[in-house]
Amino acid sequence: MKRKMKAVAALSLAAVMLLAGCGSSKGTQDGGSTTAADTAEQQEGTETAASDSGEKIVIRVVGPMENENDTTNPVTKQTVRGYYVIKELYEAEHPNVELQLTGIPWDSWQAKLTTVAAANQVDVVVHGASIVDIVEDLTPYAEKDGDFLDGLLLKYSYRRADKSNYTKLVPTGIPITAAATSIMYDKKIFDDYGLDYPDETWTWEDVLDAAKKMTGTDPVTGEQTYGYYIDGASSDWVGRSMIGYYFSKDTKVIEYADKQMDTKVNYTSPEALKGFEFVNELAKTCPKGFLEGRGAENFGTENNNIAMWYSQNLVSNYQKTESLGLTDRYGYAYSPVLENGREGWANFTGDWNMAIAKNAQNKEACWEFIKWMATNQDIADWCWEGGKIPNNKEAIERLSAENIPFADVFFNT
């Protein structure tokens, strides 16, 4: 009973956090500031003047960027280059620019970025699209120089940036990587239990039914298996299965109004409560330590005992199975389908985005840098190397030509 209440409490908090923060026309600027379009024109003149004078343009890039120095993947044993690669590549192509990169940990990243912006210490905000009070509306930049956006899978990170018109979505960031959710599953466990693999027709009820059947003693090996895994170490991930359930059922738990303060949240309706009940049932099919991020250490290996993982870790899990020679054992399936006559899947696509700070020193130069980050093929390879999917159609098509098993799932969702 204690475990059940703990899971429900965590799900409640996670759902609110997820809907409030990270996930996928001009907003009103802060008092006394110019419009983004005017600023872009002014900054272009500033950049030209700086170039003519021989002075270097400084772009301060701040945000969550993983590791600064090289690391070694403990499973694949491959070297993963640090984010210094960004500086080396960009400055080599743009000798008039000095990049100053500052990585921060994911812990309390939004608060830290808000503080840095208030101190006028950032130009490009890494993963800052959700912090709408400190970043630019990118509409005027895209209207002036946005042809490259057609080459991206996700053109923008949208947010409700104008609190006086909260029903309107505004582009506040450009995704550099994209992370679609899918169900990664262990074919051997499905085979041991005599069950069909997940496919593009599965509903959330199909997932739960299969998860329940595969939680218990494996009829072939005699070992304990679990039907499902939720990455409970990340609080928003605990809620994403529930959000996916709401999405598939077309259940509205948030009613957006014109003004932010008039927006209503309702988790007590019969339809909303079904989401809590459903995910609580899913939680019963997870390893006991999932709320602390434990229990999936062997997923992707020969000794795995988890049948399904609803995850965005497509690349890192694939790299793991590839290094162990187990790519044939694991499969990738779509997120559960949308119901009530709608087409598609209940997919959550996250990103690692870049945004322009409202008080950036040279906004035109920032836009050029972000455009380069989104389209450069060397950067795309670096993202893949680090276990992420580049948000770049050319790169994805090039990588999918190598027969990556989840390519179709990613493209279609």
Positions of predicted regions on the chain:
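Glycine-centered hinge/linker elements that transmit conformational signals in sensory
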Residues: 211, 256-291, 334-338
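Short helices/loops that flank or line small-molecule/ion binding pockets
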Residues: 110-121, 190, 208-213, 295-309
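Conserved N-terminal structural module of periplasmic/extracytoplasmic solute-binding proteins
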Residues: 7-10, 22-132, 146, 197, ...
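Hinge/lid segment of periplasmic solute-binding proteins
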Residues: 51, 127-180, 331-335
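Long, aromatic- and glycine/proline-rich binding clefts that accommodate carbohydrate-like moieties
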Residues: 333-334, 384-413
